Amino acid sequence: MTENSTSAPAAKPKRAKASKKSTDHPKYSDMIVAAIQAEKNRAGSSRQSIQKYIKSHYKVGENADSQIKLSIKRLVTTGVLKQTKGVGASGSFRLAKGDEPKRSVAFKKTKKEVKKVATPKKAAKPKKAASKAPSKKPKATPVKKAKKKPAATPKKAKKPKVVKVKPVKASKPKKAKTVKPKAKSSAKRASKKK
């Protein structure tokens, strides 16, 4: 009985520690933006100066340096930060626009709006289906071309007319028939002479 009572309170502090870790500091992206705003350098602030500012103003863990590198890269790719010098996470960075504090609030609003926008995307799918329907009309145009092709077939019909000219050559056998009677007549003449 006593063992169960001692084990139960031990589990509660672990949950409390987990909640404290989430409340110790804001997001790294927000801290980086705050650090750059605090320095106010036109040339931009370096990653080392950003790390110093974050470590001095916020309670950050041991892996803060790697987290800062990753978040700086993300902010550069999203367009929140502009890299003035260097490549990757090294170099100096400055805010893309001066309205960054409003932007950080806008990011939270956009997250909520993204859920709302998800439903219009479903409504956009029927629009895609409607766009498929007009695509059937261009398919009807090749049918018109097919109608033109039968018009080309009468031209082919003219060629058989040329074939009809060939029976005229068949009249030559008729001449051959006329030759045969001559042979008979010569045979008759020969018989008369006898």
UniProtKB/Swiss-Prot annotation:
Basic residues compositional bias, start-end: 105-194
SUPFAM superfamilies referenced in this protein's UniProt entry, alphabetically: Winged helix' DNA-binding domain (SSF46785)
Chain segments annotated as transmembrane: none
Domain H15: 24-97
PTM sites of type N-acetylmethionine: 1
Family per record: Belongs to the histone H1/H5 family.
PANTHER family attached to this UniProt entry: HISTONE H1, HISTONE H1.0
This protein's name: Histone H1.0
Species this chain originates from: Mus musculus
